[in-house]
Swiss-Prot record:
Protein name: Snaclec 4
GO terms of molecular function: toxin activity
Main location: secreted
UniProt similarity note: Belongs to the snaclec family.
Organism of origin: Daboia siamensis
Superkingdom, natural source: Eukaryota
Residue intervals passing through the bilayer: none
Cystines in this chain: C27-C38, C55-C144, C121-C136
């Protein structure tokens, strides 16, 4: 009986020590992980509204990419550079409700912006590392995030 308690206690200690560590975050095949989110670059080119709809159809909770820090933006720029030659991709920032207020398509707070100017739909120009306003009917590749 004493040995059983000793083994049980040992397993409990191992479990508790491992539960305090953060497990590796895994994304589905073809998606890349960064800071508890998954990202995927798609080569299909479409307008902003179709791009947002496309992203929502890829995975539950997926939207056009939202960027909340310079570090996250660097990660996405590198991901795009590895997958596309095209220098511009849609991001999920736009004047969603036409009320002169910028908002991420995933409804996240706008904490970080690298805007060249404000307009209705934005693309990220990867080689310049800036965001630029563009007509929402412009055709560009897509980066989705969930």
């Amino acid at each position: 009986m004493g040995r059983f308690i000793s083994i049980s206690f040992g397993l409990l200690v191992v479990f508790l020590s491992l539960s305090g560590t953060e497990a590796a975050f895994c994304c589905p095949s073809g998606w890349s992980a960064y800071d508890q989110n998954c990202y995927k670059v798609f080569t299909e080119e479409m307008n902003w509204a179709d791009a947002e709809k496309f992203c929502t159809e890829q995975k539950k909770g997926s939207h056009l990419v939202s960027l909340h820090s310079r570090e996250e933006e660097k990660f996405v720029v590198n991901l795009i550079s590895e997958n596309l030659e095209y220098p511009a991709t849609w991001i999920g920032l736009g004047n969603m409700w036409k009320d002169c207020r910028m908002e991420w398509s995933d409804r996240g707070n706008v904490k970080y912006k690298a805007l060249a100017e404000e307009s209705y739909c934005l693309i990220m120009i990867t080689h310049e590392k800036v965001w630029k306003s563009m007509t929402c009917n412009f055709i560009a590749p897509v980066v989705c995030k969930f």
